[in-house]
Amino acid sequence: MATAVRLLGRRVSSWRLRPLPSPLAVPQRAHSMLPVDDDINGLNEEQKQLRHTISKFVQENLAPKAQEIDQSNDFKNLREFWKQLGSLGVLGITAPVQYGGSGLGYLEHVLVMEEISRASAAVGLSYGAHSNLCINQIVRNGNEAQKEKYLPKLISGEFIGALAMSEPNAGSDVVSMRLKAEKKGDHYVLNGNKFWITNGPDADVLVVYAKTDLTAVPASRGITAFIVEKDMPGFSTSKKLDKLGMRGSNTCELVFEDCKVPAANILSQESKGVYVLMSGLDLERLVLAGGPLGIMQAVLDHTIPYLHVREAFGQKIGQFQLMQGKMADMYTRLMACRQYVYNVARACDEGHITAKDCAGVILYTAECATQVALDGIQCLGGNGYINDFPMGRFLRDAKLYEIGGGTSEVRRLVIGRAFNADFR
């Protein structure tokens, strides 16, 4: 049965998130879920229900753990939670029904990314790496045997997926990668490493880019994509990285020492990996833009109620004009970002995928999320600066989106070059 039926057929009832305890003078009611006006956002009834269903689930099962996950840099129940996401049908949200997917679009994918990130941006990032960077790449580029072998377990949550592209000296300049894949009989032998790999310590299945021709000119012609399993001989992971933000979304270095990968595990064709890579980047940037949306909404969830509980000079601080200005700035940034992201997602669902706007949505939402997080800290004053409140976590998490998946500088280059190409 299609998982879309499981996902969208649930009855949605109203709920209210239990407020997080505060150790200070602000009452516990200071945190509540703010309503999202999806009539303005242009969502249909199924999309509204999708948001409500996922929001209810993650606010009950993930949000109360978000601070602990951040502080310990560990999500102890990751595997169990992943299977719950699988049972909801959201891990393979864009995958075909025949493999257990929900067969929905990129707008729905963004909505789920947003709501998970609203509860925990770190877990939202891991979800994006699994559902888009890994699953969607196999859906778009895998052959039938690969899809039948890998997709069902990735979609159910039995397996965790990742994508490995970056290296210590090949981040934005990804085609300069040095991970080498040499063909020997019916296998390829991989030697080298990958770095900053989201889900790396946990992944069972990884989409890995390697050089099958180190002398190719241009260098992009020598790249091949492989599907690598964690138990393949010669593959290992280094210790988990201790990051500024997105803590609990596990990241590490991957090590390939004479790692044997069957030739049957080539994703697409030999030396055609750059096409897999570049076509996937546009949709990666779009889906990941849901992360900053969720962070901004979480900031508002904590900030707006706080401003109407905290008192100074004999009145609620939300009554001061400067604080009203902060509220207006945060809200309008979020709403402008939502409209841009949702409209680009709709266009992609209709087959109109543009690198310029996929880069644009992650550029704009990432930088707005950082500013909204800073504004939220300012609104809470001293409480915003201590770790009893989550405001610092929002800022640290938001900053990742200006760096990961292509930096803000690279996104500006993508947009600028697109305009220049129109005038050649």
Curated annotation (Swiss-Prot):
Lineage top rank: taxon: Eukaryota
Cofactor(s), by name: FAD
Chief location: mitochondrion
Residues the record lists as binding substrate: 172, 220-221, 275, 282-285, 405-406
BP-aspect Gene Ontology terms: branched-chain amino acid catabolic process; fatty acid beta-oxidation using acyl-CoA dehydrogenase; L-leucine catabolic process; L-leucine metabolic process
PROSITE patterns in alphabetical order: ACYL_COA_DH_1 (PS00072), ACYL_COA_DH_2 (PS00073)
UniProt cross-references to Gene3D superfamilies, sorted A to Z: Acyl-CoA dehydrogenase/oxidase, N-terminal domain, Butyryl-CoA Dehydrogenase, subunit A, domain 2, Butyryl-CoA Dehydrogenase, subunit A, domain 3
Signal peptide annotation: none
Any one GO cellular component localisation term in the record: mitochondrion
InterPro entries in alphabetical order: Acyl-CoA_DH_CS, Acyl-CoA_Oxase/DH_mid-dom, Acyl-CoA_Oxase/DH_mid-dom_sf, AcylCo_DH-like_C, AcylCo_DH/oxidase_C, AcylCoA_DH/ox_N, AcylCoA_DH/ox_N_sf, AcylCoA_DH/oxidase_NM_dom_sf
Binding site for FAD: 163-172, 196-198, 310, 321, 378-382, 407-409
UniProt similarity note: Belongs to the acyl-CoA dehydrogenase family.
Protein name listed in UniProt: Isovaleryl-CoA dehydrogenase, mitochondrial
Classification of source organism: Eukaryota, Metazoa, Chordata, Craniata, Vertebrata
